[in-house]
Curated annotation (Swiss-Prot):
Residues 1-19 form the signal peptide. Belongs to the neurotoxin 10 (Hwtx-1) family. 13 (Hntx-13) subfamily. GO terms for cellular component: extracellular region. Expressed by the venom gland. Residues 20-50 form a propeptide. InterPro entries: Huwentoxin-1. The lineage of its organism: Eukaryota, Metazoa, Ecdysozoa, Arthropoda, Chelicerata. It is found in: Secreted. This is U7-theraphotoxin-Hhn1i. Ion channel inhibitor. SUPFAM superfamilies: omega toxin-like (SSF57059).
Length: 90
């Protein structure tokens, strides 16, 4: 009887250690994934765009893409890039 109880307690201790190791590994993976996402986000923010995309705010110093034109669209109170009814050539 003592051996059975000792075996059960030992098995529970082993499962607790394995569970703790799994949680630590999962947390490290989660932190690594979060770090990778922030790294990608920072890299995309530093890239300069050549032109503003559809419905992007535009001014003289921020031109729209070729198939868009900077125009005023009610009820928006600032100029945005709107479609000029042409398609970009490939």
């Amino acid at each position: 009887m003592k051996t059975a109880i000792f075996t059960v307690v030992l098995a529970l201790a082993v499962f607790a250690v394995l569970s703790f190791g799994w949680e630590a590994n999962e947390k490290a993976l989660s932190e690594e994934f979060t770090e990778l996402i922030h790294e990608k986000e920072a890299a995309s923010e530093t890239e300069a765009r050549e032109c503003r995309y559809f419905w992007g705010e535009c001014h003289d110093h921020m031109p729209c893409c070729d198939w868009l034109v900077c125009g005023y669209k009610w009820p928006i109170t600032y100029n945005i890039c709107v479609w000029n009814r042409t398609f970009p050539e490939k």
